[in-house]
Amino acid sequence: VTPFLDTNVLVYAALSDDPRCAIAERLLAAGGAISVQVLNEFANVARTKLKWSWPDIEAMLTLVRSRSGRVQPLALSTHEAALVFARDHSVGFYDALIVAAALEAGCDTVLTEDMQHGRKFGALTIVNPFIESAP
């Protein structure tokens, strides 16, 4: 089953001086589902925090989309499911959107460092691929 890649995987893949870069690049090369939210969040981080130019952002997003097994849209059903996850599991709304999109994409794993490693949402498991390489 295809894993779902959270925004931080894309961000670390773009940071060549970060020890997590090599792991993130391998994950990105292997492919995985993402959502439109992940693309949007990366564009925002790349522009505001990394100070990338728009052409560089567009090039990275084109690369990400080409390697991704699937880009999950954000539909009303995603929004509604995220509201339920946020309410019932005490997670932030944007994390709940990631969970909802991953489930809609048919993923069994979310690769992220933003949620508790090993936490389960039904058949979906949160995995932090950066545990051993955190600075």
Which residue stretches match the model-derived regions?
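Acidic, PIN/NYN-like endoribonuclease modules and their adjacent C-terminal/linker elements
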Residues: 99-135
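Acidic active-site catalytic centers that drive phospho-/nucleotidyl reactions
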Residues: 6-8, 41, 95, 114
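Active-site neighborhoods of divalent-metal-dependent phosphate/nucleic-acid chemistry enzymes
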Residues: 70-113
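Short, well-structured N-terminal submotif of metal-dependent ribonuclease cores
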Residues: 1-35, 49-59, 133
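Structured helix-beta-strand junction loops
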Residues: 30-31, 67, 89
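Active-site-proximal, substrate-binding regions of enzyme catalytic domains
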Residues: 41-69
